[in-house]
Amino acid sequence: MNYAKLCEDLTKWIKEEVESANLKGAVFGISGGIDSAVLACLCKKAFGDNALGLIMPIKSNPKDEEDARILAKSIGLRFTKVDLNESYDALIGTFEKNSVEMAASNIKPRLRMITLYYYAQNNGYMVLSGSNRSEFMTGYFTKYGDSGADLMPLLNLYKTDIFEMAKVLGVPDVIINKKPSAGLWEGQTDEDEFGFTYEELDDYLMNNSNTKSKDLIDKKIKQSEHKRKFAKSFEFDRRNY
């Protein structure tokens, strides 16, 4: 693929979509990871100073914030840090003590989504998500969290595409070379949770290749099907009532 042309076309598309909504820029999270880094680069090209990145730590690895700052400095991105630790602690404190770890972890991206929309409305911006196709198809996202956005520019691009785009866009090596992680807890990595690599996953999704992880991938796709659909509603014919 010609990733340089893809980045140009995607930048143009983002700008057109935001302007068609009569908005002037974009706000998005910068986590120190590669997806948000690629999104930040595209938005910076599209909007200049009207691209705003938010660093939103919640029990996060300090190295991730450091990497997010390195990215912002390298591309001249305007950014703000919003520390959500106290908000998270206050919310968790109102719940039962023996909560499921994942239920508590999923609060983090939902708090970030709320924060992004606050800044979007205050600035006349659109909320953009860095979710990619690999994560979307396996359900590796939080409903109404990192999937809560107005625009998902990377949703039809696989994780392996994101890595190639990062090289074209000049994302710092410290981000390109780190293991992808949702940062849900210390030491957590995407591929450890999956049980397979992004290369395996993307090859299977794109080419239906024969991989030893086929059954596991199919299971994740099936189990997460509900996450890719709008909430169902009761359908009825008024003439029957």
Curated annotation (Swiss-Prot):
Keyword set, alphabetical order: ATP-binding, Ligase, Magnesium, Metal-binding, NAD, Nucleotide-binding
Residues binding Mg(2+), per UniProt: D35, E135
Disulfide bonds: none
Listed EC numbers: 6.3.1.5
Residues that, per the record, bind ATP: G29, I30, S31, G32, G33, I34, D35, S36, K159, S181
Catalyses which reaction(s): deamido-NAD(+) + NH4(+) + ATP = AMP + diphosphate + NAD(+) + H(+)
Enzyme superclass (EC): ligase
GO cellular component, one term: cytoplasm
Pfam families: NAD_synthase
Pathway this chain belongs to: Cofactor biosynthesis; NAD(+) biosynthesis; NAD(+) from deamido-NAD(+) (ammonia route): step 1/1
Top-level lineage group: Bacteria
InterPro entries attached to this UniProt entry: NAD/GMP_synthase, NAD_synthase, NH(3)-dep_NAD(+)_synth, Rossmann-like_a/b/a_fold
Similarity comment text for this entry: Belongs to the NAD synthetase family.
Assembly description: Homodimer.
HAMAP family in alphabetical order: NadE_ammonia_dep
Protein name from the UniProt record: NH(3)-dependent NAD(+) synthetase
Underlying gene: nadE
